[in-house]
């Protein structure tokens, strides 16, 4: 069996131990001191679970706002090389058309379910429901008043994949949208 030899691993109720990990079909099949492990590569390192990135706009020269499956795949492959196994594709305040295109691309990728890298776990919708007084790097002309109906249209376009929304609760409609998001299990 191929795997990792002499690596440090945290095991629940035991602690950090030096052990071997056998891998079959891309999955952990064995953890223990069996010596019959053919090393994938020489290491004396630490094995940790894959990281989850809940706010990433892009990587590898691609951006979630490119609105294409190819861009999301580029991000996915880049993140996997860095130890990230799942991520939320993060949008930004842009035209409704650009946001919708980005969300539709996430829907396509998630429906297909085939990943060569990190899994697209959903969407972090950053804006457009932000404060016009505090836009930061977001373009003011695309800031929208917090609105549950508009959010629902975006969520439908994403295949109900929106998990987190960055918004301004202090603006008119903000608390109403927060309540709506809370009711459907979306973090605001």
At which residue positions do the language-model features occur?
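Histidine-rich, glycine-flanked metal-binding segment
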Residues: 1-48
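Residue-level signal for inorganic ion chemistry
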Residues: 7, 26, 55, 79, ...
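Histidine/acidic residue-rich metal-binding segments in metalloenzymes
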Residues: 36, 109, 145-188
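Short amphipathic alpha-helices and their capping/turn segments at secondary-structure boundaries
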Residues: 36-38, 42-44, 102-117
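Amphipathic, non-transmembrane alpha-helical secondary structure
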Residues: 69-77, 81, 100, 104-107, ...
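Divalent metal-dependent hydrolysis catalytic cores, especially in the metallo-beta-lactamase
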Residues: 73-102, 119-131, 158-170, 184-188
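Glycine-rich phosphate-binding loop of ATP-grasp-fold ATP-dependent ligases
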Residues: 133-143
């Amino acid at each position: 069996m191929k795997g990792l030899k002499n690596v440090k691993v945290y095991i629940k109720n035991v602690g950090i131990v030096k052990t071997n990990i056998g891998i079959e079909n891309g999955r952990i099949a064995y953890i223990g001191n069996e010596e019959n492990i053919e090393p994938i590569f020489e290491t004396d390192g630490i094995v940790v679970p894959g990281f989850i990135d809940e706010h990433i706009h892009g990587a590898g020269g691609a951006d979630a706002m490119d609105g294409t499956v190819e861009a999301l795949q580029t991000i996915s492959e880049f993140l996997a090389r860095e130890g990230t196994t799942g991520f939320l594709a993060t949008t930004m305040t842009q035209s409704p058309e650009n946001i919708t295109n980005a969300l539709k691309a996430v829907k396509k990728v998630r429906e297909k379910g085939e990943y060569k890298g990190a899994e697209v776990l959903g969407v972090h919708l950053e804006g457009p429901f932000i404060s016009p007084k505090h836009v930061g790097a977001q373009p003011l002309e695309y800031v929208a008043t917090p609105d549950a109906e508009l959010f629902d249209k975006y969520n439908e376009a994403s295949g109900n994949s929106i998990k987190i929304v960055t918004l301004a609760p202090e603006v008119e409609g903000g608390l109403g949208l927060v309540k709506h998001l809370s009711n459907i299990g979306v973090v605001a």
